[in-house]
């Protein structure tokens, strides 16, 4: 079994706590369906205008040159590309909030996750989340699970405003925010490049091999198929 550090566990979401298919087939579908209407209804709002600036910057154009229709089309293309663009993630979070709060959307969390998180928390381990989805989207996902509200299990949530998930600096900043040394934090993810970045920052790492995730023969990270394979 993979060793658990005494102080903190930092978890990824997609492919780690949650089935990749829920993110791509359900959440992304909701975002695609509702994005154009949201952009039109909230033009001038902070999330829409931040996204407009990002699209304009990429095109080398002024914000005024990007119409609502062009903005929606560009953002839909980014969703299809699975772009980890912070402004897109913030906008998606707003769209998902409406879907969750209407009662029409419940998030998937693997059955082994909640018991393990509760066990680790009861042992005094700090729990935190690091995902490319916005903090708002993370909290919505864990608040509206089929098992109920799990947000109270976590001390902190981090998104790409902290830094890209494949850069060591982001993990160093997270450790600092938690008041810990990187070596006191265990990062759980299904993505080797993210684990490499966390390890470069000094964190301990375990790769989750959920269904559909293949083990990388060149990876040096410990592996586990379930959270209950990770023993304190």
Curated annotation (Swiss-Prot):
Q: How does it assemble?
A: Monomer.
Q: What is the name of the protein in this document?
A: Enolase-phosphatase E1
Q: Which CDD domains match?
A: HAD_EP
Role summary = Bifunctional enzyme that catalyzes the enolization of 2,3-diketo-5-methylthiopentyl-1-phosphate (DK-MTP-1-P) into the intermediate 2-hydroxy-3-keto-5-methylthiopentenyl-1-phosphate (HK-MTPenyl-1-P), which is then dephosphorylated to form the acireductone 1,2-dihydroxy-3-keto-5-methylthiopentene (DHK-MTPene).
The gene is mtnC
Taxonomic path: Bacteria, Pseudomonadati, Myxococcota, Polyangia, Polyangiales
Q: Does the keyword Metal-binding apply?
A: yes
Protein's organism: Sorangium cellulosum (strain So ce56) (Polyangium cellulosum (strain So ce56))
Can you list the disulfide-bonded cysteine pairs?
Answer: none
For this chain's record, the cofactor binding note is: Binds 1 Mg(2+) ion per subunit.
Q: Which GO terms describe its molecular function?
A: 2,3-diketo-5-methylthiopentyl-1-phosphate enolase activity; 2-hydroxy-3-keto-5-methylthiopentenyl-1-phosphate phosphatase activity; acireductone synthase activity; magnesium ion binding
UniProt-listed GO biological process terms: L-methionine salvage from methylthioadenosine
- Identify the pathway: Amino-acid biosynthesis; L-methionine biosynthesis via salvage pathway; L-methionine from S-methyl-5-thio-alpha-D-ribose 1-phosphate: step 3/6; Amino-acid biosynthesis; L-methionine biosynthesis via salvage pathway; L-methionine from S-methyl-5-thio-alpha-D-ribose 1-phosphate: step 4/6
Q: Can you tell which superkingdom this protein's organism belongs to?
A: Bacteria
* Pfam families to which the protein is assigned, alphabetical: Hydrolase
Which cofactor is recorded for it? Mg(2+)
Keyword Magnesium in record: yes
